[in-house]
Design a protein with these regions (language model features):
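A broadly used, surface-exposed interaction patch
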Residues: 54-76
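Short, intrinsically disordered/low-complexity patches at protein termini
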Residues: 68-71, 79-81, 110-112
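Coupling/hinge elements of helicase-like and P-loop NTPase modules
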Residues: 98-113
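GIY-YIG nuclease catalytic motif and its immediate N-terminal context
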Residues: 1-50, 57-58, 80-91, 114-116
Length: 116
């Protein structure tokens, strides 16, 4: 499945801590997301699904996610229909091995293009 991963204005990756969750873009935005850290060895910190602005807001206050903040935290998301989300999240978790989160949907993975 080919999905459109979102970037912020200027075609740059969105910083987790400052992306404007009040922007109209987030109204009714549901799907999957990826949070990663920068630095010399960038890595995926968390993947998930749901109402994007709510999930991002939650992870801004999650100590496990914020432990990687000194490396720079970034987020991207894609709108995915509800019936595909579990499979897409399962694929992302298997492919990206996030550092935080251990319970992912036990379903057949649905492969999607990665944002990088």
């Amino acid at each position: 499945m080919n999905v459109k991963w979102i970037k912020c204005n200027g075609e740059v990756w969105c910083p987790l801590g400052t992306v404007n969750l009040s922007h109209a873009h987030f109204d009714n935005m549901e799907g999957v997301y990826i949070i990663w850290h920068g630095g010399n060895n960038p890595a995926t910190v968390r993947v998930g699904q749901g109402i994007i602005k709510d999930r991002i807001a939650e992870h801004r206050n999650d100590p496990q996610v914020q432990a990687y903040a000194p490396l720079g935290l970034f987020v991207t998301w894609a709108s995915i229909a509800t019936n595909y989300r579990n499979g897409v999240e399962a694929f992302l978790a298997a492919k990206l091995s996030p550092k935080v989160g251990e319970r992912f949907p036990n379903v057949v993975p649905i492969e999607v293009n990665l944002p990088w």
